[in-house]
C-alpha cells in the first residue's frame, strides 16, 4: 500500500495522463483515505467506508486510464468490468458477484508473486540443482557437478537442450459446476485438484533450452516453499481492504426516464449492484470476501441517459461526482508529446528497432492535433483514441517499408501530414452518407 500524499499521487498521474485535474484530485483523496484509515484504531477503521466515485465524461478522455494507473501506483488488486456484461440474478449470464470472485483471483496472483520474490534466492538454488541433475544425472560425482555448475553460472550452457520434469496442471479435467450453486465460485469443484491430491502430483517431461528452463523451475520451487492457505488468507484481506473495482459503461444500464417496461440488463443489474457496493459477503471457492471497504469507481459518458436516471439508491452509493472535460486541440497536442510513453515516442521507438530514425517537427505535431480535433468535431468524438487512427495512417507507408530503409532519417513535417493523412479528412466527409 502506497503512502504517497494526494499531491504526489496527482503528480504521478500527470506523468501519464494530460489534464482532468478534478478526476485526479478525487482519486488521489480516495487513495490517501485508505492510508489514513490504516492509522485508525480497529473499531473506528471498521466504520470508515470508502467514498465511491462516479466519473462522467465522453469516451477517450482518460476515465479508465486514471483508475488503471491509480491501481498500479497503489499495488492494489484492480479489476475493470463493463456493467453491460452482467445480467440480473436468475437469468442466464454473469451475475455481479463474479466481480468480487475475480478480484480475489487477482489478489492471489499479486500476493503469490510478492511471496515468490521473498523466497527467490532459495528457489533459484533449488532450480539450479535440478538443471545440473538434468545435465549430468542425479548420481554423478560431486566434482562433475561442480564443473558443470561453474559452466552453467558462466552462461556457457545456456543454449544446450535439457529435459526437465515439471508439474502437470492437468489441462484435460478442469472444473465441474454444481447445479444450483453460483458459477465460478463456491459452487465449482476443480477435479484436477481432487485427483492430484488422491494420486500424487502428475509430472510431465519438457524439453527446452537451459536459459528457458530457469523461470518455470524457479516458480515451481518457490511454490513448494509457500503456504497456499496463508497466501489465500492474505489475498482475501488485500482484496477486502485495498481492492479497486472500475465499473465502466454504467450509463448503459441506467434506464431512461421515458423508457417503458423492465429490462434484464438494466434495472435488475442496478439492484444487484446495490448490496455489492454498499457492502456484502460474497462466497468464493477460496473463502468469503466482504466488499464493505472495496473502492468502486463507476464511469459513463451519459450521452443519452443522465446520472439521475439511475436508481436513487445507486446514486447515493456513488457520492463523489467528477465531470471530465472533452479534449481540446491543445490537449491533443499535449497528449502527443507530454506523457512518458506518448504516441510519438512509441512510434519513434518501434521504427528505431528497424534502424529508421523518425523526427517530428513542431508544425507536424500541430497539424496532427488539428486533424484529430477536426475529426472528433465532424465525425464522432472519440477523444484521444482519434490520435491512434491519425498516427497509424501517418506512418503506414514507413512501417510497411521500414525493413528496406534501415539507416534512413525521415523528417515528418506539416506537408507530410497533409499529404498522408489529408485523404482521411476527405473520406470522413463522405462517410456519413454510407450505410
Curated annotation (Swiss-Prot):
The keyword Cytoplasm applies. It is found in: Cytoplasm. GO terms for cellular component: HslUV protease complex. It holds the Pfam family ClpB_D2-small. GO terms for biological process: protein unfolding; proteolysis involved in protein catabolic process. ATP binds at residues 18, 60-65, 248, 313, 385. Its main location: cytoplasm. Keywords: ATP-binding, Chaperone, Cytoplasm, Nucleotide-binding, Stress response. Signal peptide: none annotated. One of its GO terms (molecular function) is ATP binding. A double ring-shaped homohexamer of HslV is capped on each side by a ring-shaped HslU homohexamer. The assembly of the HslU/HslV complex is dependent on binding of ATP. ATPase subunit of a proteasome-like degradation complex; this subunit has chaperone activity. The binding of ATP and its subsequent hydrolysis by HslU are essential for unfolding of protein substrates subsequently hydrolyzed by HslV. HslU recognizes the N-terminal part of its protein substrates and unfolds these before they are guided to HslV for hydrolysis. HAMAP family: HslU. Belongs to the ClpX chaperone family. HslU subfamily. This is ATP-dependent protease ATPase subunit HslU.
Amino acid at each position: 500500500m502506497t503512502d504517497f500524499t494526494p499531491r504526489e499521487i496527482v503528480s504521478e498521474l500527470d506523468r501519464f495522463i494530460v489534464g482532468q485535474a478534478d478526476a485526479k484530485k478525487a482519486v488521489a483523496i480516495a487513495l490517501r483515505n485508505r492510508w489514513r484509515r490504516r492509522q485508525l484504531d480497529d473499531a473506528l477503521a471498521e466504520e470508515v467506508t470508502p467514498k465511491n466515485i462516479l466519473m462522467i465524461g465522453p469516451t477517450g478522455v482518460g476515465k479508465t486510464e486514471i483508475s488503471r494507473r491509480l491501481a498500479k501506483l497503489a499495488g492494489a488488486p484492480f479489476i475493470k468490468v463493463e456493467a453491460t456484461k452482467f445480467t440480473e440474478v436468475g437469468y442466464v449470464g454473469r451475475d455481479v458477484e463474479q466481480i468480487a470472485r475475480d478480484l480475489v483471483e487477482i489478489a492471489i496472483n499479486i500476493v503469490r508473486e510478492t511471496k515468490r520474490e521473498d523466497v527467490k534466492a532459495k528457489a533459484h538454488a533449488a532450480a539450479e540443482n535440478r538443471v545440473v541433475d538434468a545435465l549430468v544425472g542425479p548420481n554423478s560425482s560431486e566434482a562433475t557437478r561442480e564443473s558443470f555448475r561453474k559452466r552453467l553460472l558462466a552462461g556457457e550452457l545456456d543454449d544446450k537442450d535439457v529435459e526437465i520434469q515439471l508439474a502437470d496442471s492437468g489441462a484435460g479435467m478442469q472444473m465441474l459446476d454444481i447445479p444450483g450453486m453460483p458459477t465460478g465460485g463456491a459452487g465449482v469443484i476443480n477435479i484436477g485438484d481432487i485427483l492430484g491430491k488422491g494420486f500424487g502430483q502428475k509430472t510431465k517431461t519438457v524439453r527446452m533450452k537451459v536459459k528457458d528452463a530457469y523461470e518455470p523451475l524457479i516458480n515451481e520451487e518457490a511454490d513448494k516453499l509457500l503456504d497456499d492457505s496463508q497466501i489465500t488468507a492474505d489475498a482475501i484481506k488485500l482484496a477486502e481492504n485495498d481492492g479497486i473495482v472500475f465499473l465502466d459503461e454504467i450509463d448503459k444500464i441506467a434506464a431512461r426516464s421515458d423508457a417503458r417496461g423492465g429490462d434484464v440488463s438494466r434495472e435488475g443489474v442496478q439492484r444487484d449492484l446495490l448490496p455489492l457496493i454498499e457492502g456484502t459477503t460474497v462466497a468464493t471457492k477460496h473463502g468469503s470476501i466482504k466488499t464493505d471497504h472495496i473502492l468502486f469507481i463507476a464511469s459513463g459518458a451519459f450521452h443519452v441517459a443522465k446520472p439521475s436516471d439511475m436508481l436513487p439508491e445507486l446514486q447515493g452509493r456513488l457520492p463523489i461526482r467528477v465531470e471530465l472535460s472533452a479534449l481540446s486541440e491543445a490537449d491533443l497536442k499535449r497528449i502527443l508529446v507530454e506523457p512518458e510513453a506518448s504516441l510519438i515516442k512509441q512510434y519513434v521507438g518501434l521504427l528505431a528497432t528497424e534502424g529508421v530514425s523518425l523526427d517530428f517537427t513542431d508544425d507536424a505535431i500541430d497539424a496532427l492535433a488539428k486533424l484529430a480535433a477536426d475529426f472528433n468535431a465532424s465525425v464522432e468524438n472519440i477523444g484521444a483514441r482519434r490520435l491512434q487512427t491519425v498516427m497509424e495512417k501517418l506512418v503506414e507507408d514507413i512501417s510497411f517499408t521500414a525493413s528496406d530503409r534501415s539507416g534512413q532519417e525521415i523528417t515528418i513535417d506539416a506537408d507530410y501530414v497533409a499529404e498522408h493523412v489529408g485523404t482521411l479528412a476527405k473520406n470522413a466527409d463522405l462517410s456519413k452518407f454510407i450505410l
